Amino acid sequence: PTLITLYGMPSACGLKQLSPFVVKVEMALLYLGLEYEVEHISPLKVRSLSPAGKVPWIRMGKSTLSESDSIIAFLNGNQDGDLFDGLTNDQRVLGLALKRLTEDHLYWLMVWAKWISETSRAALAESLLDQYPRPIRMVISAVTKRQISAMCKTQGIGLMSADERGKEAVKDLTALSDQLEKMPFLLGPDITVYDFSVAAMLSSILFFKPTNWLSDMAKNHEVFPEYLGRVSDRLGDYEFIQD
């Protein structure tokens, strides 16, 4: 079989893989038992190297494919996998709703928490751009802050007060923790494709260093680290944390 190359961000700020969407695809690769290698791309090169201008993407032989959901669906179909089998219609509806909550709402709160705060952004710049002198890092950091702030304003999170963002985060985290307290995985006794989205995002929030207001909030939910432990075990001791 052709070796799959998964392209992602480097390790940074306590996380083995900075992008939760790359973590999500890596979990699918492990679940499906596929052979793969991870190629870490400098954030400054992602736009020019990636077919879609962002991570993740994969290469198999001469073909490339982008978008985490498209990659997972392709790998599952190619492998005759069971990632989408055995789910009831109600489970699919709930799984999709929680995936959207995580990837299209909580994600933006996480981006704001990591990139807008001075401490957090400085740690990211140092971690990701350590090969550049400090003045260049500071310029890139300031430009990145402006770009991310603009994206978050378009999305809506960036137009809220800190207090409003906090309330939104509480709602998202409580919804996830309420669901995860009912059963070992998101939808039942075993892992499903929706766990990859939720576990990837929660790990990216919880294990990020330095801590920020969102990671502090997430730590109030004891079920999150327990759940991530179960996901890791199920995928053969998957490591979320940077060595």
Give residue spans per PLM region.
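GST-like domain detector, emphasizing the conserved glutathione-binding G-site
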Residues: 1-138
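Amphipathic alpha-helical segments that form well-ordered structural scaffolds
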Residues: 24, 28-31, 168-179, 230
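Acidic carboxylate-rich catalytic motifs and surrounding loops in phosphoryl-/glycosyl-chemistry enzymes
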Residues: 39-45, 189-191, 242-243
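GST-like fold's C-terminal all-alpha helical module
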Residues: 108-217, 223
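C-terminal helix/juxtamembrane-tail motif
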Residues: 230-243
